[in-house]
UniProtKB/Swiss-Prot annotation:
This is Mitochondrial import inner membrane translocase subunit TIM22-4. One of its GO terms (cellular component) is TIM22 mitochondrial import inner membrane insertion complex. It comes from the Eukaryota. The chain crosses the membrane at residues 21-41, 70-88, 97-113, 120-137. It is a multi-pass membrane protein. Belongs to the Tim17/Tim22/Tim23 family. One of its GO terms (biological process) is protein insertion into mitochondrial inner membrane. It comes from Arabidopsis thaliana (Mouse-ear cress). Essential core component of the TIM22 complex, a complex that mediates the import and insertion of multi-pass transmembrane proteins into the mitochondrial inner membrane. Its main location: mitochondrion. PANTHER family: MITOCHONDRIAL IMPORT INNER MEMBRANE TRANSLOCASE SUBUNIT TIM22.
Length: 142
């Protein structure tokens, strides 16, 4: 039998806004770390006239910019996906892979909408397929 605290915690977590914001923050953190890691691996073209200190500062700025961009992208992706999945789950009153596919489509379409309708459709299909494959790989739903 769950305690009152466990029931309250579950009620808070069932709130779509809480899920979305939490996923956005976690996605932003992941994007920040990935940006730092990938920025460190990047081999920028530096001028031979730059001193070691100038090269270090240039590389640090590039890493920071890449990290910030990755942070924003992953935060938005996590927030949109989580919010869409939660809303669809509550509307359908089911917890299955269809929710993941719809949320993936919404996320992919909205993330690539700036490229026009064709890009939005490709983003929708691609992210939906990717989301379902990840879902099947981790087998969250039984």
């Amino acid at each position: 039998m769950p305690t009152i605290e466990e029931i309250r915690a579950q009620e808070v977590w069932n709130n779509c806004a809480v899920r979305a914001v939490t996923s956005g923050v976690m996605g932003g953190g992941l994007g920040l770390m990935m940006g730092l890691f990938l920025g460190a691996l990047d081999n920028p073209i530096t001028h031979d006239t730059m001193t070691a200190r100038q090269q270090f500062v240039f590389t640090a700025k590039q890493m920071g910019q890449r990290s910030w961009n990755s942070c924003k992208t992953f935060a938005v992706m996590g927030l949109v996906f989580s919010a869409a999945e939660c809303i669809v789950e509550k509307a359908r009153a089911k917890h299955d892979t269809v929710n993941t596919a719809i949320a993936g489509c919404v996320t992919g379409g909205s993330m690539s909408a700036r490229g026009g309708p064709k890009a939005a459709c490709i983003g929708c299909a691609g992210f939906a397929i990717f989301s379902v494959l990840i879902e099947k790989f981790f087998d969250r739903h039984t």
